[in-house]
């Protein structure tokens, strides 16, 4: 397998949650990391969290719904080795009969179309032999709760995106990581005061008997970057949640 020592890795969504966990793990393996997020405040906090990286971290603010900002991002980043995208905001959660068209449109624009645009502009400066790794989620693999139609549809689309792009962009490798529930700021925002009870119930049902942290999910992204013979695949890192 390849090594990340001396490689440049761009992490879209790297200012918090899974993306920040991937950034920390990537730095531990000797890479240079570029974290990208929408919020300058979160980026500054992430830089402080990663402050032991001896200047190997840079941060860029960019909105993934704005193609001009994505294009400028990769112009500024210039040549790099690996792309990781964990970006995406809170999904719509209303039942279909109460779904608001504009809320759905914004989520699709942010999560799916944003991924397309990131791939479009990243490939201009991605080095030969590099990789792209996107993020889907558990909703595509198990019966979703009522109100989960939109997020399930988008999560499912990423497997097909990776398969198509792995052929179109070869030899660039394109893969997807599909996590289950992860203890992140986004989950806390969605669950509110119910988070603790939800986590306790789910952990008791999972074969892994615990809820993942970003550090539990990060090794899958490392594998996707380092494994030179893995492309077009979806890696299910869910503690067995897709089985229950």
Residue ranges and their predicted role:
Residues 88-105:
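Conserved mid-core segment of classical short-chain dehydrogenase/reductases
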Residues 210-237, 242:
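C-terminal substrate-recognition "lid" of short-chain dehydrogenase/reductases
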Residues 15-17:
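Conserved glycine-rich cofactor-binding loop
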Residues 107-108, 117, 131-170, 181-182:
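Catalytic loop of short-chain dehydrogenase/reductase
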């Amino acid at each position: 397998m390849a090594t990340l020592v001396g490689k440049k890795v761009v992490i879209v969504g790297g200012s918090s949650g899974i993306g920040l966990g991937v950034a920390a793990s990537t730095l531990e393996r000797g890479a240079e990391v570029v974290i990208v997020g929408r919020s300058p405040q979160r980026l500054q906090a992430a830089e402080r969290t990663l402050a032991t990286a001896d200047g190997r971290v840079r941060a860029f603010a960019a909105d993934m719904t704005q193609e001009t900002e994505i294009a400028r991002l990769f112009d500024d980043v210039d040549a790099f080795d690996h792309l990781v995208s964990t970006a995406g905001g809170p999904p719509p959660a209303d039942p279909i009969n109460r779904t608001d068209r504009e809320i759905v449109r914004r989520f699709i624009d942010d999560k799916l179309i944003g991924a397309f645009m990131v791939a479009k502009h990243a490939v201009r400066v991605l080095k030969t032999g590099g990789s792209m790794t996107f993020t889907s989620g558990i909703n595509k693999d198990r019966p979703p709760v009522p109100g989960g139609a939109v997020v399930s549809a988008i999560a499912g689309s990423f497997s097909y995106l990776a398969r198509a792009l792995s052929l179109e962009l070869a030899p660039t490798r394109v893969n997807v990581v599909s996590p289950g529930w992860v203890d992140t700021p986004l989950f806390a925002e969605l669950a509110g005061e119910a988070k603790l009870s939800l986590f306790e119930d789910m952990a008791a049902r999972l074969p892994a008997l615990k809820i993942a942290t970003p550090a539990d999910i990060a090794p899958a992204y490392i594998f996707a970057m380092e494994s030179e013979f893995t492309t077009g695949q979806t890696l299910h890192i869910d503690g067995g949640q897709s089985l229950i």
